[in-house]
């Protein structure tokens, strides 16, 4: 008879959790930042607020965003005007839209990841799904499992209302699942739609205006497993360690409150300083065990909360400009897609590395870091190890 220890050892994988495929998706509707102020004030029936529109236009100009993809269209706003009004009761219709579209958009990214992986979907043992909006029972994880035709025995984890740091949270969760369940293949999906936060402008809510200028819709997916079979699977990044911390006395720095009017967004002006002043401690704790203290020796996957956050982190750590290129590219092309962003950036980095004929998926470097920042103020830190782009 086997002992508990022998049984547990047999349950565990031998190697580190590894990302085996990545997929991303966006809605079809694209908005361009250069004329978004005109669009936004027109569809919210706010063109009479000329001074506020000028202020919003300046926010858009400084956002470093070229375009975003947004599910909500002008036709939908005409049909449901309360969504576009400032603080009008509208949660019911927002929920109707979100609970249908969040899993559908997640499916689009998941299908791309599954196609790249190339293995039967029946081999997916676990599903980890996160979104900032659309809480219901059964949840988006259940709907996605059905949309994809996953096995009814798939073990699901659903994370709601985590916010922008959750791209790190889902990787941390997937790492634990993959490494503690031999043979596990974990499908991770982040799907974000801004229908829950969209509303008209107000002089009394400038932090809400910042959110209207930054956030976009998108979904991303990865497949994670330990001990990959390299004859049929292609490793991309290893998940070496993962940690979460929150900054004391910063509970309201980034916040969202779900009310009859939807999800309201709140942001302290000093968020870039709070993050930049605390990020090096996270780096030190993560990389001291590896003997790494040169932050420019790492490849960087940082959540693009906004240009001010990226600038502050870059300056505080004396990072070379190229370190945040992949992050800035995703911000420019898609905006801030909350939890989905960091997986978009991972995808951009591996593609850029292959296109540039770099030696590894991490732009030729071995070690990297993935950061998620969000409500709490919470920081997720994931240590990554790249893999060679060419195998012998």
Swiss-Prot record:
Record GO terms (molecular function): trihydroxystilbene synthase activity
UniProt keyword list: Acyltransferase, Cytoplasm, Genetically modified food, Plant defense, Stress response, Transferase
Listed pathway(s): Phytoalexin biosynthesis; 3,4',5-trihydroxystilbene biosynthesis; 3,4',5-trihydroxystilbene from trans-4-coumarate: step 2/2
Compartments in which it is found: Cytoplasm
Enzyme class: transferase
Induction text: By stress, including UV light, ozone and pathogens such as B.cinerea. Strongly induced by ergosterol, a non-specific fungal elicitor. Positively regulated by jasmonate (JA) and methyl-jasmonate (MeJA). Induction by phytopathogen attack decreases with grape berry ripening.
Enzyme Commission identifier(s): 2.3.1.95
Chemical reaction(s) catalysed: 4-coumaroyl-CoA + 3 malonyl-CoA + 3 H(+) = trans-resveratrol + 4 CO2 + 4 CoA
Record carries keyword Transferase: yes
InterPro entries for this protein: Chalcone/stilbene_synt_C, Chalcone/stilbene_synt_N, Chalcone/stilbene_synthase_AS, Polyketide_synthase_type-III, Thiolase-like
Subunit and interaction comment: Homodimer.
PANTHER family linked: CHALCONE SYNTHASE, HYDROXYMETHYLGLUTARYL-COA SYNTHASE
Protein name: Stilbene synthase 1
Organism the protein comes from: Vitis vinifera
Gene: VINST1
């Amino acid at each position: 008879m086997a002992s508990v220890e022998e049984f547990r050892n047999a349950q565990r994988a031998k190697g580190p959790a590894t990302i085996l495929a990545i997929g991303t998706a966006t809605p079809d509707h694209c908005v361009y930042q250069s004329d978004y102020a005109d669009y936004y004030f027109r569809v919210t029936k706010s063109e009479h607020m000329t001074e506020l529109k000028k202020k919003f236009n300046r926010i858009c100009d400084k956002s470093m965003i070229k375009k975003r993809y947004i599910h909500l269209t002008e036709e939908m706003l005409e049909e449901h005007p309360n969504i576009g009004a400032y603080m009008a009761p509208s949660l019911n219709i927002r929920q109707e839209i979100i609970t249908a579209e969040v899993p559908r958009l997640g499916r689009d990214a998941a299908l791309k990841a599954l196609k790249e992986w190339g293995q039967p979907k029946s081999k997916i043992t676990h599903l980890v799904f996160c979104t900032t909006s659309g809480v219901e029972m059964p949840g988006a994880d259940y709907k996605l499992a059905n949309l994809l035709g996953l096995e009814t025995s798939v073990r699901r984890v659903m994370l709601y209302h985590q916010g922008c740091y959750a791209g790190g949270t889902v990787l941390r969760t997937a790492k634990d699942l993959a490494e503690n369940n031999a043979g596990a293949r974990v499908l991770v999906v982040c799907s974000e739609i801004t229908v829950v936060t969209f509303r008209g402008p107000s002089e009394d809510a400038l932090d809400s205006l910042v959110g209207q200028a930054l956030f976009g819709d998108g979904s991303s997916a990865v497949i994670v497993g330990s001990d990959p079979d390299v004859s049929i699977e292609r490793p991309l990044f290893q998940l070496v360690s993962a940690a979460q911390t929150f900054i004391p006395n910063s509970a309201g720095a980034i916040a969202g409150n779900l009310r009859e009017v939807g999800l309201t967004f709140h942001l302290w002006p000093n968020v870039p300083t709070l993050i930049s002043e605390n990020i090096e401690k996270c780096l030190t704790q993560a990389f001291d065990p590896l003997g790494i203290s040169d932050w420019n020796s790492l490849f960087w996957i940082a959540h693009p909360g906004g240009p001010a956050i990226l600038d502050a982190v870059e300056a505080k750590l004396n990072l070379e400009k190229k370190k945040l290129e992949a992050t800035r590219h995703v911000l420019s092309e898609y905006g801030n897609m909350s939890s989905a962003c960091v997986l978009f950036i991972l995808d951009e980095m591996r593609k850029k590395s292959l296109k540039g004929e770099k030696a590894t998926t991490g732009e030729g470097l071995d070690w990297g870091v993935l950061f998620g920042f969000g409500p709490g103020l919470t920081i997720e830190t994931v240590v990554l190890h790249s893999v060679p782009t060419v195998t012998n």
